[in-house]
């Protein structure tokens, strides 16, 4: 049995114990005793509520304190200075954005190199096929040999450049280990906060039930709807001539102002 059930059980036990005593005190006219019994019931209810709020506060504080990063992770020293969950998520966005921009820059630098090599290879392939069909004269063949030699050199250089870019792209993804850990911790924290708030709501609803407190759910829903749409206009009135709460002319306006003392 958790503490909330214990607190509610204590309140229920006290309520059952004092209910009959309260009735007897009222019937016998001992109003002082009745007031004292009511006071004890209120104290029991408040004590249980305060205990639960304190417990939930301690659990929430413990969850926040334990919100740490593995010190062996890269860049852990920098992120360990960040204590707010929102700032941690912003830090994740910063790392992710930086890695994405770096990756796109490297891809943009590699694309022209690959396109140029592809075009050169296509042109050489066409001329090589002509050579294989013995359609190339000696001077043109010597030029073809020079082009092939240049292509091989250029191809090796382009390959080294693209290979380096691919390696840099791979290194740019190292942020995922750190950001994954940060997001996992934030998710755990949010889950714990949600769970604790749910416990508080459930406990408060039980206290309301024992205290006989009833809420106007229709009014609460209407207020929540107004909060969601604070700028929603009422718009033009439909069938205004059939409604008594709508002014339809200057005479009605004058009567309204007169009734308000203007």
Curated annotation (Swiss-Prot):
GO cellular component: bacterial-type flagellum; cytoplasm
Basic and acidic residues composition-biased segments: 218-232
Biological process terms in GO annotation: archaeal or bacterial-type flagellum-dependent cell motility; chemotaxis; regulation of chemotaxis
UniProt cross-references to Pfam families, sorted A to Z: CheZ
Residues carrying the site annotation Enhances dephosphorylation of CheY-P: 181
Region Disordered: start-end pairs: 218-250
UniProt entry keywords in alphabetical sequence: Chemotaxis, Cytoplasm, Flagellar rotation, Hydrolase, Protein phosphatase
EC numbers, comma separated: 3.1.3.-
Broad EC category: hydrolase
InterPro entries membership: Chemotax_Pase_CheZ, CheZ_family_phosphatases
Top-rank taxon, per record: Bacteria
GO molecular function, one term: phosphoprotein phosphatase activity
Subcellular location: Cytoplasm
Biological role stated in the UniProt entry: Plays an important role in bacterial chemotaxis signal transduction pathway by accelerating the dephosphorylation of phosphorylated CheY (CheY-P).
The family this protein is said to belong to: Belongs to the CheZ family.
Subunit structure: Homodimer.
Stated name of the protein: Protein phosphatase CheZ
Organism, scientific name: Pseudomonas putida (strain ATCC 47054 / DSM 6125 / CFBP 8728 / NCIMB 11950 / KT2440)
């Amino acid at each position: 049995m958790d503490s909330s059930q214990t607190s509610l059980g204590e309140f229920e036990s006290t309520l059952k114990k004092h209910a009959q005593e309260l009735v007897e005190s009222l019937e016998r006219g001992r109003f002082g005793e009745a007031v004292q019994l009511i006071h004890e019931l209120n104290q029991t209810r408040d004590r249980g509520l305060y205990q639960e709020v304190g417990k939930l506060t301690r659990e929430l504080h413990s969850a926040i304190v334990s919100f740490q990063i593995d010190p062996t992770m890269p860049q852990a020293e920098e992120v360990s200075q960040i204590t707010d969950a929102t700032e941690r998520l912003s830090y994740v966005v910063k790392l992710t954005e930086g890695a994405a921009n770096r990756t796109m820059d490297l891809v943009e630098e590699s694309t022209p190199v690959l396109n140029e090599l592809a075009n050169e290879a296509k042109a050489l392939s066409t001329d090589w096929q002509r050579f294989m069909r013995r359609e190339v004269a000696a001077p043109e063949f010597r030029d073809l040999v020079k082009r092939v030699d240049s292509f091989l050199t250029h191809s090796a250089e382009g390959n080294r450049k693209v290979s380096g870019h691919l390696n840099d792209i791979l290194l740019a993804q190292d942020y995922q280990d750190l950001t994954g850990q940060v997001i996992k911790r934030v998710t755990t924290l949010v889950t714990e906060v949600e769970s604790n708030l749910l416990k508080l709501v459930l406990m408060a609803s039980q206290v309301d039930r024992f205290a006989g407190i009833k809420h106007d759910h229709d009014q609460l829903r209407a207020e929540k709807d107004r909060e969601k749409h604070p700028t929603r206009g009422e718009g033009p009135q439909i069938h205004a001539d059939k409604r008594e709460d709508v002014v339809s002319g200057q005479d009605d306006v004058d009567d309204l102002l007169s009734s308000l003392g203007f």
